[in-house]
Amino acid sequence: MIWLTLVFASLLSVAGQLCQKQATCFVAINKRRKHIVLWLGLALACLGLAMVLWLLVLQNVPVGIAYPMLSLNFVWVTLAAVKLWHEPVSPRHWCGVAFIIGGIVILGSTV
């Protein structure tokens, strides 16, 4: 159950980062303020809940194991950036993502 909490904390943290990115996207001048307030408000909510879940994780998992698992954030953000904003990702970046996943598997298997 705690590992599910860790994954959910990671996903909420990523959602907060993505909301911040969305807040910076161009909108018509007459809708800009509402757009920014909406997306930054969602970012704060996601990041706040992620922090609470992260504290629960830290109560149950050694920080040396838990913290590297947040490297998943780099994977989630890359996938979301490609899907949501069609951002280009270089082969070198994908190689880095593969190394991150490999590292998470290695660290996760020690538990």
Swiss-Prot record:
Which gene name belongs to this protein?
Answer: arnE
Q: Give the family per the record.
A: Belongs to the ArnE family.
Where does the UniProt annotation locate this protein? Cell inner membrane
Judging by the UniProt lineage, the source's domain of life is Bacteria
Q: What is its main location?
A: membrane
Species for this entry: Escherichia coli (strain K12)
The transmembrane residues are 36-56, 62-82, 88-108
Residues in the Cytoplasmic compartment per record: 1-35, 83-87
**Subunit comment:** Heterodimer of ArnE and ArnF.
* Alphabetized NCBIfam families for the sequence: PRK15051.1 (NF011625)
Q: What is this protein called?
A: Probable 4-amino-4-deoxy-L-arabinose-phosphoundecaprenol flippase subunit ArnE
Query: What membrane topology does the annotation report for this chain?
Result: Multi-pass membrane protein
The UniProt entry, under SUPFAM superfamilies, shows: Multidrug resistance efflux transporter EmrE
What taxonomic lineage is listed for the species of origin? Bacteria, Pseudomonadati, Pseudomonadota, Gammaproteobacteria, Enterobacterales
Q: Name one GO biological process term.
A: lipopolysaccharide biosynthetic process
Membrane side Periplasmic: which residues?
A: 57-61, 109-111
Please explain the role this protein plays, according to its UniProt record.
Answer: Translocates 4-amino-4-deoxy-L-arabinose-phosphoundecaprenol (alpha-L-Ara4N-phosphoundecaprenol) from the cytoplasmic to the periplasmic side of the inner membrane.
Q: Which GO terms describe its molecular function?
A: carbohydrate derivative transmembrane transporter activity; transmembrane transporter activity
